[in-house]
Amino acid sequence: MDEQEPVHIPIEDSIDLHSFAPRDVVAVVDDYLHAAREAGFTDVRLIHGRGTGAQRAAVQRLLREHALVERYWDAPESRLGATVVRLRRPHP
């Protein structure tokens, strides 16, 4: 079996987490935050949806302790369906 080359997906200032399994969301967000900072973003939006609130809670639990996160807040226009994250600036 031939190995396929990885698909390059450009990093944008938001990620929609609806297509990821709940068990994978924390790892996906962690990887995304590292890639977003490397790409030079200061603020990013994590779209987790409203639903039961479980995914939002899991995401915000990670953000509370994450070394790259300066602060985060509920995106005002999303009615609790998205979280905005301010990333720490890299040290020179």
Describe the role of every protein-language-model region.
Residues M1-P92:
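Long, charged, low-complexity intrinsically disordered regions
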